[in-house]
Regions:
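N-proximal low-complexity "stem/linker" segments adjacent to membrane-targeting elements
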Residues: 1-33
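Glycine-rich, basic loop-to-helix element that forms the pyrophosphate-binding segment
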Residues: 72-88, 101
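Membrane-interface aromatic/basic loop that binds lipid-linked glycans or pyrophosphate carriers
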Residues: 119, 279-370
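Cell-envelope/extracellular polymer assembly enzymes that use nucleotide-activated donors
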Residues: 10-13, 41, 200
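Short beta-strand/loop segment that forms part of the nucleotide-sugar
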Residues: 39-48, 68-73, 97-98
Length: 370
């Protein structure tokens, strides 16, 4: 079928949210149109861009009728993505951020894997990517978001794949069956000014999926040198808290006993709160902790911050934060956050909790409870 003809019954709908990305969107669309899998539609949701993005989109749409531009007033990522979900006609849905680049053959690999395993979700890895300029060379680092224990398997995440809940959301290195998303009412948070909505979407997918397939291949280049990325924004201090409130609202609106998933969500919340804390300025860190600490304390009092689910290091960090935020801040400033291994864990437990915390962990393990 010629790529110049509008796909009437696409196998896959690719959602591409666009806002002021004139520097990057051309490379993004080129990578999609170069795929050897051709039966797709590209829904490009223009969120009221004020730069030259719209003109670039028109050029591409005039050359390839698989590209459909959806214009809307600027109202944020969540509303844009939900608009795309509502208008998608494909059996499956992929997400491609407008500053990223899809790997060759990625769309075919995702689609064929989904069909082979009758999967609701297919998830793969990706590259961290710096495109380079006149002063720096292009480089890419492979990022393994899929745990080794899940590669090549068909998994029900809530039963035999809990590790995936704690990985970087990366909703764009995946393929989702459209009727699965609609049946489970999986959408994005639409609150004006919201951010990091990928975390909530990611949680809802893993909490709902009965058949998720995980592959080792990297599926796209995730741009790291876009200075306007929301991850780099020092503002939006409390957006991560809003996103977690939405995850809990969605979960508790579903039938069934959610105690275990609420504990999983508790660990996710603490991890995401630490990530948010680390990216903020000193002044904003204080402001954030003034709200985050009571929120975490409420979860602790509900029994949702479970030591066995969180692990000894994170649980000791949590106890330090809730007991003495000032000590937590001093320790976190001194300790390297990228250290790993048994010795690093011992150092972290000692730094945050002292010898008493380390003794507790050792006696728990020697007693066979861990």
């Amino acid at each position: 079928m010629s790529s110049a003809n509008r796909v009437t019954t696409p196998d896959t709908s690719v959602l591409i949210p666009v806002y002021n990305v004139e520097r990057y969107v051309g490379a993004c669309l080129d990578s999609l149109l170069a795929q050897d899998f051709t039966n797709f539609e590209a829904l490009v949701i223009n969120d009221g861009s004020t730069d030259g993005s719209r003109a670039i989109l028109e050029q591409y749409a005039s050359r390839d009728k698989r590209i459909r531009i959806i214009d809307k007033p600027n109202s944020g990522y969540g509303i844009s993505m939900n608009r795309g979900l509502a208008e998608a006609r494909g059996t499956y849905i992929a997400i491609l951020e407008s500053d990223d680049v899809m790997a060759q053959g990625a769309l075919r690999l995702l689609y064929e894997t989904a069909c082979e395993h009758n999967a609701e979700v297919v998830k793969g890895n990706f590259w961290l990517w710096w495109s380079g300029n006149e002063d720096t060379a292009e480089r890419a680092e492979l990022f393994h978001v899929v745990p080794d224990s899940l590669i090549g398997k068909v998994v029900t995440p809530t039963v035999n794949g809990l590790d995936i809940f704690y990985q970087k959301p990366s909703i764009w290195s995946a393929l989702y069956r459209a009727d699965f998303l609609r049946q489970e009412r999986i959408q994005f948070l639409e609150t004006p000014g919201a951010s990091y909505q990928d975390a909530g979407f990611n949680f809802k997918v893993w909490a709902s999926a009965q058949r998720a397939v995980f592959i080792d291949e990297p599926l796209l280049k995730y741009r790291q040198d876009n200075e306007t990325s929301s991850v780099r924004s020092p503002g939006k201090v409390f957006c991560v808290m809003d996103e977690h409130a939405e995850m809990r609202r969605w979960l508790e609106a579903r039938p069934g006993d959610h105690r275990m998933l609420l504990k999983v969500l508790g660990r996710m919340k603490f991890n995401n709160y630490l990530w948010n804390y680390d990216r903020l300025s000193d002044e904003l860190r204080t402001t954030f902790l003034e709200r985050a600490c009571p929120d975490l304390a409420a979860d602790r009092d509900e029994g949702l911050l479970d030591e066995q689910i969180m692990g000894p290091v994170k649980f000791t960090e949590l106890q330090c934060l809730l007991t003495s935020p000032e000590r937590f801040r001093r320790v976190r400033e001194k300790l390297p956050q990228d250290a790993s291994g048994g010795l690093a864990s011992v150092r972290q437990i000692l730094a945050y909790g002292g010898i008493g915390a380390l003794w507790h962990v050792l006696t728990e393990r020697l007693g066979g409870r861990r």
